[in-house]
Amino acid sequence: MAERNSASWNRKVASFCSEPKTFLCDSSVDGFLGELLKDLQSEAIHGQTKILMMDLLLEFPEFLCPDQKTVEMTAETLMNILKKMPSSERSMTLRCHLLLAIETVLITCESFNQNSKMAQDFASLLMHIISDVNDKKQGVANRPLRTTACECLRELESCYPGFLSQRMEKLYLMQQQEVTAAHQSYTLLYTVVLKNAIRFLAQKEGPSNGALKNALLSNEDFFWSATENMVELQPSSNEQLLLLPSNSETKDLKSILALLLEDSYLLTPVCQNTLFWQIVQVVAMARTISPVIFKSQLVRLFSTMDLSCFHSILQMKAVFTDSLFTGEDEHFLIQRLVGMTQHPLLSTPVKLFYLDCLLHFPENRPLTSNSEENLPVLLTVQMTSSLFPNVFNDHSTMLCRQNVLSMVYLENEGSYSEKGIAFLFEHVMSLYSMVHKNGNREITATFFRAVHLFVQYFNFCEKHMENLTEKLLKLYMSNSSLAPNFINLINQTQILLEFHVWPVTLSKALQKEIVNLPTDKWTMKNLGWHLKILSRVAQENSISQSSTALFLRRVVFCSDLCSKGDWRTGNALLSVCKHVLQHQKLSAIFVHLADLLQYLMHRFEDIDVQDRARLYYVLLTNVSSDKLGKILTMSPARGQTKSRSLSSIMTENENFSTMLTIRNAEKTLLCLQPVLEGIKAFTCISDSPSLYCIVLQFENTDCRFESISDINVPCLFVDRKPPVVTINLVPKEPYPTIFSVSATYSTQDGITYQTKLDPLYITFREMFIPLPLPALWPLESRFDLFGKLWSAFKPDEQNQFEESIFCYEMSNNSLHDIVLDNFSKFAVSCNGGEYKIAVFLPPQFHILMHIKSQDDTACFSVRTDNWNLLPYLNSHLLDITLQ
C-alpha cells in the first residue's frame, strides 16, 4: 500500500469528518485504520498532518475501533509510536496528542479495565511521566507532556471515580514539590482524587474509624475495581452524603485543604473555580470541617472582576448559605450583581450572566424551594432603578432588564411601583414606534416579546392593556404582514393567561377591523394575511363568526378572485371556512356559509379548491354540527381511520403536513446493482415489500459530466422482477468522476422518504470507446488511419499532444492475455507480438498505443491529443499489469 502524502491525508481526513458512515461504506474499517496507523509511523508525513490524522481517533473512536481486538491493536500501535519518538521539543505536540488518542480509544470503547494489558501499561506510563517533578530528568522541554499526562489522569479519575484513590500520598507529595507552571495540573489532579476518595468513604456512612487517614497515606497500586462500575458523580448527590472523621483525621484533612486554598491564587481563574468546587464538595461531606475555612478566600473573591471566580462565590453560597455568608454579605453580593449588570467595560454576554444570577440568586433563607426565576428578598425597587431598559440597549439586554424590573414592580406596591410600570409601558411604546416606522426583523421580534412580557406581568392594569390593544390594532392595519407575529402573540398569551380575556379581546378587535375593510386593491393585496388572522379568530367559540362569513362572501362575490383561480388564496379561504364549520354557533351563519361554498365549488378556476369546497358544502348540508366537528378534527393517530382517508387530508391537520413532509429514512431500503458489464444499466433492489413513486436523483461532484436527469420508477415489489434503469452519461471531460445518488420514494402508508444510495463511480476505463468508424471498413484502412493519427499526434510546443512510454516486466504470453482481456475491442492490428490500439474518449480525445515486448519487458508507447489523460492512463496500466 503506497504511502499517502500530507496533502492527500488532509483531503482524506476532511472527507471522513464530513460523513464518517458514508466514508467507511466505500472502504473497510480495518483497511483504513491500518493505513492510518502505518502512515503515523512514516517520516514522509508532516507532524501537523499526523496530528490531524489522530483527530479521527479523538473524534470518532467508535467508528474506527468497533471491537475490543481492534482497540487493543490500535492502543498498542500508538504506544509503540510514542515510545520510539525522540524527547525533542519539535515532537512534543505530537507526543501529547498520542497520549490523548490512546486514552480516548481506551475509555470510549470501554476497554480501560484490569483485563486489558494496554490499559495497565498506559496508566503506569502516565504515572511515570508525571513523576519527573520539576523537570529534573527530562528537562523543561518535557513539561507539556507532564501537563498532558496530569490531565489524562484527571480524566481517568473523573470517568472511574476512585481509580487513583490508593495513590494519594504520592500524588500529594508531587503536588507539594512541583513549583513549575505544571503545578496547576498537579493540584487539580490531586483535588479530584481527594474529593472522590472522601465521597467513597462517605457512602459507607458513620465514623470513618481511621479509613480517611489510611486513604490519605495510601501509596499502593491502582484501584482497578473502580473501572468495573462507572459511577456518575452528580453535584447534588454530595448533599446526602456524610463523613464523620476523627479529630486527628479532621486536623490532617483540614491542613491539606488549607494548603490547597493557599495555593489557589497561583491558578488561572477557570482552574480556581474547579479547585474551589472540588473543595466545597469535600467540606460539604466532611461535616467536622467548618465552611469558615473559605473565609480568607472570600475577601479576595468579593472584589474579583473575573466571571469564573465570582461564580465560585455563588457556588459556595448555594451550598453553605448562612453557615458562611452573613446578611451583610448577601446584601453586598446583590448590590455587586446589580452593578455588574451595567458595567461599561463588560461584554453583553457577561452582563446577561449577572442578570441571570439575580434571577437565580442562592439566598440564605429563600421563600420558595423551586428552581424557577425568583428575585432575592433583599432586592428593592431603589436598587434596580438604574436597570431601566432603553432602545439603545441590545435586544437581549432590553428584554432581560424588562423581565427583572417587571418582577420587581409586581412584588412591590406603592408609588414607585406604579411609576415603574408606567415607565415600562412607555418603553414598550417606544419599541412600537420603531416597528411602526418599518423596523427591521430583529426589532419587530423584540417588540412582540416585550409585549408578551408586559402582558404576562401586568395584565391586571386595564388602562395600559386597553392602550396596548389600540396600538396593536393600529400596527396591524398599517403592516398586515405581521399577521404571524399577532397569531403567535395570541397563542402564547392564551397559554400563559388561561382564564384571562385579553387574548380573546385582541382577536375580536382584529376581526372587527378586518371585516370592515372595503374590497379595494389594498385589501386584496393583503388578503392572505387577513385570512390567516380570521382563521385563528374562527377557533374562538366565544367570538361570533357572522361578520367573518359576510366578509368572505363579499370578497368572493365582489372581486375577480375566482376568475384568477389562485390555489394558495383559495385554500386560505377554505381554511377559514373549515374553522368556521367547527364553530359552536354554526346555525346563525348557515345560509351565508352555504352560499359561499356553493359559489366557490362552481366558480373558482382551480379544480383542487373546487373539490375541497364541494366536500365542505356536502358536510355542511348533510352532517349535524356535533358530527361535523368530530369529522373535521379527526386524527388518524387517535382513531382507526386510515392514514390516507380524505378527511385527514382535507382538514389540514398534522397528518396532512406529515404526509407532505419528506422524511430522512433511518436505513437504506434501496440499492442499485449493475446488470450489464460496460453499460451503466442497473436493477433496483428493495428490502421493503413495496415502494411507490421512486425517483432516483443524481448530483455531480464536479463539472466533468452533464447533469443526469432524474429517473422515475413507478413501483417496486419484493416478489416481482426488479426493474432495470439505464443511465445516460454525457462527459464534458474524459476524466473519472463520482455521482452522489439519492432516492425519494413513498411507502404503503403514504409517507414519503428520502435516502442516500451508494455513490455512482465512473472509472477511466469505462469511458473507452472504439474509434467511431464504419463497420465495413477493411483492416488496411484502419491500419492506415492509425498511422496517420500517430503522425498527427506528434507533440510540439504549439499543441497539447504528448507521448509517453510505460514499461513492465512480463512475458509475451502475459502481454497477449492483457491485450486480449482489456483492449480487444480497440485493437487495430496484432502482428508478431506487436499491437496497435486506438481508443476514443468522448467528447473529442484519443489515446493511441503501440505495444510490443522486448526481452520479457512489455513496452507501451503512447500518444494522445490531451496530455492530461496520461496520469489516468498510467494508473490504469498499472492496475491491469499488476493483476
From Swiss-Prot:
Signal peptide: none annotated. InterPro entries: AP5B1, AP5B1_barrel, AP5B1_C, AP5B1_middle, AP5B1_N, ARM-like. One of its GO terms (cellular component) is AP-type membrane coat adaptor complex. One of its GO terms (biological process) is protein transport. Keywords: Protein transport, Transport. Probably part of the adaptor protein complex 5 (AP-5). As part of AP-5, a probable fifth adaptor protein complex, it may be involved in endosomal transport. This is AP-5 complex subunit beta-1.
